[in-house]
Amino acid sequence: MADKENSTPASAARLTRSSAAAGAQAKRSAAAGVADGGAPPAKRKRVALSDLPTLSNAVVVAPRQPHHPVVIKPSSKQPEPAAEAAAPSGGGGGSPVSSASTSTASPSSGWDPQYASDIYTYLRSMEVEARRQSAADYIEAVQVDVTANMRAILVDWLVEVADEYKLVADTLYLAVSYLDRYLSAHPLRRNRLQLLGVGAMLIAAKYEEISPPHVEDFCYITDNTYTRQEVVKMESDILKLLEFEMGNPTIKTFLRRFTRSCQEDKKRSSLLLEFMGSYLAELSLLDYGCLRFLPSVVAASVVFVAKLNIDPYTNPWSKKMQKLTGYKVSELKDCILAIHDLQLRKKCSNLTAIRDKYKQHKFKCVSTLLPPVDIPASYLQDLTE
């Protein structure tokens, strides 16, 4: 027993020396590995939220025409969404895709296709709720100092702002939805219309973007016409009107589902349909008259006109599209004609931001494509059983 007790400290010492030697050998091996060009596995430090740097957007004022507000060019740009300037990614079963996976209106691309039909039904039920809609006649019924042309100029400018900041498409569509819903309930002076636009864009950016522009950035893009306090106050007023429910199905929500489900096998045709659909959908935002149509109706009509542009000799509508969208051509006819007129420049022809945007090669220059002057009457008739 005594021998065992006396041997314990010695054994412990030997173990300690052995461990130290092993540790030293491990360090030498690691150092040798680095010297030989092999890097040891890096340990990443978890950064606390309070330690994250605040991203600032240094801006340069770009001169604009007198009737346009000032547009900015940020030096630190956010990542450009792949779905807008590259091949579409994502969603099984033609599901809507969004940068914000928690958005009710824009489910993420990881959902199970077996739920696609249920989600679409849910989104359709959301869009018909009165509290989520804007009035189709608010210019005549509510506004005194704001006209449809002023609204179109504002939306055209917001398209430029979203493009300069590389904001996702959902941000633009939500912002336009917010401003229309606000104008449906509150009369506004024309000198406050741009303030409403930046307030709506600020809320939409916070909801959709990973790194949204700051309040100061939105003050700056208006050439400091409004103070920070005014922008924050407008943001608060809009949120109260929305009752802080910022998620809403938009034209883009439904357009994603429809285009994913009807794309052709050829990559070129698929991209043309994607970009032409996005172009026509943004044009529809300019037209005050399109407010009388539900977002899903506009999205379905956009797909019709886009397919007509790509292949004018084939009926754009089919039983598959009718089943997918739930709409007959007769239910879309008025909206189809409205979007066709927009593309033919019969309306909003003096507003060029969207057309200039889609003249770029990354969008396959879809705004330069000439649409058919007339839509064949047979295409606007319901399909026979």
From Swiss-Prot:
Top-rank taxon: Eukaryota
- Which keywords describe this protein according to UniProt? Cell cycle, Cell division, Cyclin
Tell me the segments the record calls region Disordered: 1-110
Record-level GO cellular component terms = cyclin-dependent protein kinase holoenzyme complex; cytoplasm; nucleus
Q: Which Pfam families match?
A: Cyclin_C, Cyclin_N
Cross-referenced InterPro entries? Cyclin (IPR039361), Cyclin-like_dom (IPR013763), Cyclin-like_sf (IPR036915), Cyclin_A/B-like (IPR046965), Cyclin_C-dom (IPR004367), Cyclin_N (IPR006671), Cyclins_cyclin-box (IPR048258)
Q: Which GO terms describe its biological process?
A: cell division; G1/S transition of mitotic cell cycle
Q: Name one GO molecular function term.
A: cyclin-dependent protein serine/threonine kinase regulator activity
Question: Where are the compositionally biased (Low complexity) regions?
Answer: 7-41, 74-88, 96-110
The text of the family note is:
Belongs to the cyclin family. Cyclin AB subfamily.
PANTHER family from the UniProt entry: CYCLINS (PTHR10177)
Q: Report the protein name in the record.
A: Cyclin-A3-2
- What organism does this protein naturally occur in? Oryza sativa subsp. japonica (Rice)
